[in-house]
UniProtKB/Swiss-Prot annotation:
Transmembrane segments: 67-86
Biased composition, class Basic and acidic residues, residue ranges: 148-158
Summary of the function given for this chain in its UniProt record: Component of the MICOS complex, a large protein complex of the mitochondrial inner membrane that plays crucial roles in the maintenance of crista junctions, inner membrane architecture, and formation of contact sites to the outer membrane. Plays a role in keeping cristae membranes connected to the inner boundary membrane. Also promotes protein import via the mitochondrial intermembrane space assembly (MIA) pathway.
Span of the transit peptide along the chain: 1-38
Organism in which the protein naturally occurs: Schizosaccharomyces pombe (strain 972 / ATCC 24843)
Record protein name field: MICOS complex subunit mic60
Compositionally biased region (Low complexity): 132-147
Any coiled-coil regions, as ranges: 214-275
Residues on Mitochondrial intermembrane side: 87-550
Subcellular location field: Mitochondrion inner membrane
């Protein structure tokens, strides 16, 4: 019992020390301003070493790795067994007796903060299963039963008054209950402090051992405990007052330090500004002087360059004046002489001008006659597109080729005309209209045919084509009828290109039927375009020659 009471007292002393320590830590943390943060050192990054090649590994390195692996496995198993000791009390005893350094390791772990906080080192084991304790408890219970035969089996609970933070209850139990409870190991948690892991809340219930203690000793211990608690409460009040005074003093000193540092900072800022201003002014003066010196050098260089240029210009002007003076003297000499050579030169120049004028007139007359011949031949070709007089047409084509051999575009157009003449006669406007009328009827008949139509289908198309188009409401028939009308209107306006485009927009069968008519239109359009190209090139060449002469 005395041993267990000493354990309780040691727990109370630890409680007081940790209360003092936690109080000072919390007071210092509260006194710090919110801007202050704890400095956290950044971890040094781990730079892995370059791996060695697998081919260069020796037997010693393999043995070293195996040894390290076995060592790590042994340490891991040893640490796991230490952790399991705090879970199973039987394994705790076995580990302490049969494992090397078992007792020392378990004791150190129990006394460390890890044992108190995580492994249950703050629990006090009350093991009443030993035979000596059982014999003592049986003897004491027999004596108590013989002396108290008239008393009841269970006494009333006696409580000792404690301060608000601690109450210990002493309960007398019968021997049968104590025997049952003595066979098990009882673990009770004292409670954990947030910082150290020590118990600060509860006291282990050691009812069996307290039954065997003397009442006077229990009272003495309780009085001592009450006095120690009263002292602790008084110390707590004093500490709270000291803490308040220290907080007030710290705040006052903090304000003084802040004001002092602000004044120092302002003085440093003013001194820095003055220093910067003086440095700026000195640098400004230095740069101004440097810039002025450079400007003076540049001005001197430019002045020398300009002076040399002026001298050169004056010399050039003097030379030109001398040349003009010599020319004027020569002119006066020539005028005064009036020799025959001068008159003969004038006559020669006038004769050359007359020759050039005659040449120009002859060239102009030839060009005009050539243009007249070209225009006449083109008019004849345009009038006689049926080529009734084929020999005359060929003569016209030959004259065109000779007249347009110098112009590439006109020569190309004349070759096109020659190909068209060789291919045969060209249809005129009336013939194209008559052929288009018959073609439009055939195209209209194809609207009622399909790709699989036979003899009866063709008869049906002939009959239906005789009916008016308003009877049919099919969009295909309406579109074909509209396309034919557009082509007819373009043909009446002499727009062969528009009529050909309209027919090409039809489907496959109508395009196949209108192929010959489209080819005839194309030949006529090619002939007309070639004639227009030759006329345009002739007029352009004449205008260019006139412009050159002008």
């Amino acid at each position: 019992m005395n041993r267990q009471l000493r354990t309780v007292k040691s727990c109370f002393s630890l409680q007081k020390t940790h209360q003092y320590r936690s109080f000072w830590i919390q007071s210092s943390l509260r006194a710090l301003p919110p801007d202050v943060k704890q400095n956290k050192t950044e971890p040094i990054p781990f730079v892995p070493k370059p791996e060695e090649g697998s081919s260069n590994k020796s037997n010693s390195s393999k043995f070293r790795k195996r040894f390290l692996l076995l060592f790590l496995l042994g340490i891991t198993g040893y640490s796991c067994s230490v952790v399991y000791c705090f879970k199973d009390p039987n394994f705790y005893d076995y580990f302490a007796e049969h494992t090397p350094f078992g007792k020392q390791v378990l004791y150190n772990v129990e006394q460390s903060w890890i044992g108190y906080k995580y492994l249950g080192g703050n629990r006090i084991k009350v093991d009443d299963s030993s035979p000596k304790l059982k014999q003592n408890s049986n003897n004491i219970s027999k004596k108590q039963n013989s002396s108290r035969n008239d008393d009841t089996k269970v006494k009333k609970d006696t409580t000792i008054e404690r301060p608000e933070s601690l109450v210990v209850e002493i309960v007398d139990l019968p021997s049968e209950v104590t025997k049952d409870t003595a066979e098990e190991s009882v673990w009770k948690d004292i409670g954990l402090d947030q910082e150290t892991g020590l118990s600060v809340t509860a006291i282990p219930i050691i009812t069996e051992t307290l039954d065997h203690a003397h009442e006077q000793e229990i009272k003495d211990q309780s009085l001592r405990f009450e006095s120690s608690l009263n002292e602790a409460n008084e110390l707590h009040g004093k500490l709270s007052k000291i803490q308040q005074e220290q907080e007030h003093l710290f705040e006052q000193r903090l304000r003084e330090k802040v004001s002092e540092m602000e004044s120092k900072l302002e003085a440093l800022l003013i001194a820095r500004d003055e220093k910067w201003q003086s440095a700026f002014e000195s640098e400004k003066l230095r740069l101004q002087k440097l810039h002025e010196a450079r400007l003076q050098q540049e001005l001197f260089k430019l002045a020398s360059v300009f002076e040399s240029k002026l001298k050169n210009e004056l010399t050039e002007q003097a030379i030109t004046l001398e040349k003009l003076h010599l020319q004027s003297i020569k002119a006066q000499v020539e005028q005064e002489r009036g020799s025959r050579l001068g008159r003969l030169q004038e006559l020669r120049n006038s004769f050359q001008q007359l020759q050039e004028l005659v040449r120009v007139v002859l060239h102009e007359n030839g060009r005009v006659t050539r243009l007249v011949d070209v225009s006449n031949t083109l008019d004849d070709l345009n009038k006689d597109m049926r080529f009734h007089k084929l020999s005359e047409v060929r003569q016209h084509v030959n004259t065109l080729k000779e007249a347009t051999k110098d112009d590439e575009l006109a020569a190309l157009a004349s070759r096109v005309i020659e190909k068209i003449v060789d291919s045969g006669p060209i249809l005129d406007k009336e013939e194209l209209q008559t052929k288009f009328d018959t073609l439009s009827k055939e195209i209209y008949k194809t609207c009622f045919l399909t790709t699989e139509s036979g003899f009866f289908g063709h008869l049906k198309s002939i009959i239906l084509s005789q009916l008016p188009a308003a009877v049919f409401k099919s969009p295909d028939i309406v579109s074909v009828k509209k396309t034919l009308e557009d082509a007819r209107s373009h043909l009446l306006k002499d727009d062969l290109d528009g009529s050909v485009r309209a027919l090409l927009s039809l489907s496959q069968w109508p395009r196949a039927l209108s192929r010959d008519w489209i080819n005839a239109c194309r030949r006529r359009m090619e002939l007309q375009q070639a004639i227009e190209i030759i006329k345009a090139s002739a007029t352009l060449s004449s205008q260019l020659e006139d412009a050159q002469q002008a």
